Amino acid sequence: IVAGSTYSFSAGSYDIFLIKTDANGNIQWAKTYGGTGWDDAFSVQQTSDGGYIVAGTTWSFGAGWGDIILIRTDANGNIIWAKTYGGTNYDNAFSVQQTSDGGYIVAGYTSSFGAGGGDIILIRTDANGNIIWAKTYGGTGYEEAYSVQQTSDGGYIVAGVTYSFGAGWYDIFLIKTDANGNIQWAK
């Protein structure tokens, strides 16, 4: 499964493009999702029931200039639900994983919320995409998360970059949280 964006087969500017291939790379199906604005996917994972969860950003839907979009599909790429998260400024998701209870954890970037010019955002949802909690992490500079994984203790490990902390410009930033998104350590 491959996720990204396309201008060639879109309803508007760019649309989210999801392609399912067989083991030899032959296309089994391809789907586009989006509206009249720019929509892009940065992460896709197969879910426990054989469907897919897609995360990215949308300028077609939501509350702001660019919002996080989460799309849940069946095994054939048909939308089961789609949700947006964000504020009046730019928000983006770079990583999504299904959690052990069937919900989702989403990591990315927000300039709508947090302490600085842009902060890491971590959103925990239930199986239907409803927010259980959302947390931001960062300082007065810029932070962005590119990957999130659930850990064996039920918490999360988040990898990204920081401009606020560290020795230089855009250092690697690793955050370990508990199951509720509270920081246990950050390095």
Feature map (PLM): residue ranges:
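A sequence-level/structural motif corresponding to short, flexible coil/turn segments enriched
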Residues: 1-187
